[in-house]
Amino acid sequence: MSQSVSLTFPDGSVRSFPAGATGRDVAESISKSLAKSAVAIAIDGGVRDLSDAVTDGKIEIITRKDPRALELIRHDAAHVMAEAVQELWPGTQVTIGPVIENGFYYDFAKNEPFTPDDLPKIEKKMKEIIARNAPFTKQIWSREKAKEVFAAKGEQYKVELVDAIPEGQDLKIYHQGEWFDLCRGPHMASTGQVGTAFKLMKVAGAYWRGDSNNAMLSRIYGTAWADQADLDNYLHMLAEAEKRDHRKLGREMDLFHFQEEGPGVVFWHGKGWRIFQTLVAYMRRRLAIDYEEVNAPQVLDTSLWETSGHWGWYQENMFGVKSAHAMTHPDDKEADNRVFALKPMNCPGHVQIFKHGLKSYRELPIRLAEFGLVHRYEPSGALHGLMRVRGFTQDDAHIFCTDEQMAAECLKINDLILSVYEDFGFKEIVVKLSTRPEKRVGSDALWDRAEAVMTDVLKTIEAQSEGRIKTGILPGEGAFYGPKFEYTLKDAIGREWQCGTTQVDFNLPERFGAFYIDSNSEKTQPVMIHRAICGSMERFLGILIENFAGHMPLWVSPLQVVVATITSEADAYGLEVAEALREAGLNVETDFRNEKINYKIREHSVTKVPVIIVCGRKEAEDRTVNIRRLGSQDQVSMGLDTAVESLALEATPPDVRRKADAKKAKAA
């Protein structure tokens, strides 16, 4: 057995340490201050306890400033919260408490569920525990000891968790003072390193193991950050997000609603449907030159989904349907008992369209697009306005091309996606390549080729953007049928939304026997590229509403102008103004009610009308208009013709304006 361990440091230097040396020993060998600020170590990228013995490899000392420390802070905060709860309410059982995005939660078995009023008490107790600065220490227990100890404490859920751990796997028990828990780790050095930049956010109910047949537990959500400034920024972002909640704004703007009879499907009101159709019309114009729009059936026999693999891989997310008569008359032997499925994706239908008729290599690439309504089952608790629904429209396209055309097609798709996002005002975009997962179809040679091409494409995207577009790699995150690009955009308050995707597919063309005739008159399987820009049109609309806080750009707004009169003497002129704006292509309503003008302005501001034109006796005499913008107290007076021309230009979609500008430039 080696008497020393060889460690490579970030600066490239290599040092030897005696076998059994811990991460803390290594940190202390560098400096006392580093040892004091260290919270963990990483060996070859794997995060470990500071008290763990080091092994040969590349070592990093992790401090609170390291992004990786955030998960440790949140993990430890969850343990501190669990201890606080059991100190305050003895007899409460702890179950599981993972780190989640922006925070953590812990589920408890308690006779009476927690209320929001309990949270300040728990926070106070947590601060006491943190102030004790008890060290986290790890022990390895036998399965028998763990079950015996937890059973004696009345922790039946922990006994069940112990039983679920595979035989031969270590059972780690972490102590913080007298309190302990079953946990895989790692943890920081002590409770004091959690700090005080945390907040408990809300309480909720949750079924044990997410199964509605099991007991209902009481869940507490919390958030924790490296410092108070980060916590304050996060809480400010949440407050902003609450103001911008598309569900609230959707009601105020009269765009859509949901109801019990149709969980997860949208009831579009007139104004909401107008925005939806504006988005679809915009996307149709962007696709008109390069894509052929098609429409595949929504209901198809399960045999097709068995061939595609969805019935095996994706069945739990699908809706199965059959004749209502067959369902209500199971004993009727004459009933049609075929089982169909509502399509969860458009791709199998597009393969059928590609296969219909012989295709030559000269015809490739063939680009098929569809605004396809798809249905996917989501648990009722996961549904969230337009962001998480059961029925939605995908701006889907599938490109069938040769292997040699793959790179050019991916770049062409990238240019389109970035251009669309820019038209909606999104400037900060991240493009990441997701590579092969462990479970996948296709040979390694196919994956090697596809990943090599897409890696080169990613480099080209980064180079062409001159630093504007950030790129990255997501190892093992690809789909089972091929690598993919994921496009993430950042909104006005800093939240990130993954929207667009470009996915190479080795699976469906092979499963369905799709082919084209190549230059040697041989049958050849095409490369299939899945492409979505918005992803879900409903979700993208929800993102737009929240990004703009309901203050939609004029070209997107369902109602662009309200003409409001101060006095009935100006009504005739108000009608003339409204008609002139309509003739210029704007969506206009009039408000000639016998109400004070400030009341009218407030009312239309609540519904987020972007432009209110005020007309009184003076404006009628001078043939002018008084323009008031949403969110501004300023008023601008201008001549009617000038106002119509200016607003018509502003209401012109950006792609239409570019085309007109290019035409003018060419004519000049």
Swiss-Prot record:
Any GO MF annotation of the entry: threonine-tRNA ligase activity
Disulphide bridges: none
UniProt-listed PROSITE patterns: AA_TRNA_LIGASE_II (PS50862), TGS (PS51880)
The record's free-text note on cofactor binding: Binds 1 zinc ion per subunit.
Binding residues annotated for Zn(2+), in chain numbering: 347, 398, 530
One biological process term in Gene Ontology: threonyl-tRNA aminoacylation
All residue ranges annotated as the TGS domain in the record: 1-64
Reactions mediated catalytically: tRNA(Thr) + L-threonine + ATP = L-threonyl-tRNA(Thr) + AMP + diphosphate + H(+)
Enzyme category, top tier: ligase
Region (Catalytic): 245-553
Pfam family, one: tRNA_SAD
Entry-linked Gene3D superfamilies: 3.10.20.30, 3.30.54.20, Anticodon-binding domain, Bira Bifunctional Protein, Domain 2, Threonyl-trna Synthetase, Chain A, domain 2
InterPro entries given in the database record: aa-tRNA-synt_IIb, aa-tRNA-synth_II, aa-tRNA-synth_II/BPL/LPL, Anticodon-bd, Anticodon-bd_dom_sf, Beta-grasp_dom_sf, TGS, TGS-like
Compartments where located: Cytoplasm
PANTHER family per the UniProt record, alphabetical: THREONINE--TRNA LIGASE, CHLOROPLASTIC_MITOCHONDRIAL 2, THREONINE-TRNA LIGASE
Subunit composition and interactions: Homodimer.
Family according to the record: Belongs to the class-II aminoacyl-tRNA synthetase family.
Protein name, as recorded: Threonine--tRNA ligase
Annotated gene: thrS
